[in-house]
């Protein structure tokens, strides 16, 4: 299980300072939509200069198939290590993205977003007319069959996804509160033990790390636990 630290701070300077504090740790860094729109592709280069971090660019691409493929191709030129697209874009979009990225000698991992961890059952059903688990199983089967590398999901769906695909089909699980911190805007949250028991391959932790007075110590504690 790998730790992915979310760089969801207010300024680029704060993000870079956090990255410097976490040098030489076996972690990934997650760059989200806010940071990417604010700081651009050069921010990725600056992070790589701090240390040879693995970068997950979390933009949740969702559009018509050709536009998604164009976007993923441009993102892949940045040298990031993992990207994500929305599973609800459908299998044609998945096929076009994976075909386009196949020309790269080293392409990023491509994960499909299933059900955002900000959803609870009631809100999810009001949109999709399905239970979360039913939709996630369907999304994961389609994603696996069309060559994606894994899914973004809550801890509660991670093991189920692997049961319906393969053990090596990756799961990245946001909403991790490692030591029982408050949920904030997440609905389906979990701790480290739950992530381990449900076979998560990547856990995403943000606020519990960067809001602590000693982020490196918290990261080291999490790494010891996993």
From Swiss-Prot:
Enzyme class at the top of the EC tree: lyase
Enzyme Commission number: 4.1.1.23
Name under which the protein is recorded: Orotidine 5'-phosphate decarboxylase
Pathway participation: Pyrimidine metabolism; UMP biosynthesis via de novo pathway; UMP from orotate: step 2/2
Role according to the record: Catalyzes the decarboxylation of orotidine 5'-monophosphate (OMP) to uridine 5'-monophosphate (UMP).
Organism field: Campylobacter jejuni subsp. jejuni serotype O:23/36 (strain 81-176)
SUPFAM superfamilies membership: Ribulose-phoshate binding barrel (SSF51366)
Binding residues for substrate: 8, 30, 58-67, 117, 177, 186, 206-207
CDD domains assigned to the protein according to its UniProt record, in alphabetical order: OMP_decarboxylase_like (cd04725)
Gene3D superfamilies assigned: Aldolase class I
Catalytic activity from the UniProt record: orotidine 5'-phosphate + H(+) = UMP + CO2
Upper taxonomic lineage: Bacteria, Pseudomonadati, Campylobacterota, Epsilonproteobacteria, Campylobacterales
Keyword presence, Magnesium: no
InterPro entries: Aldolase_TIM, OMPdecase, OMPdecase_AS, OMPdecase_bac, OMPdeCOase_dom, RibuloseP-bd_barrel
Family: Belongs to the OMP decarboxylase family. Type 1 subfamily.
Alphabetic keyword roster: Decarboxylase, Lyase, Pyrimidine biosynthesis
Keyword Lyase: yes
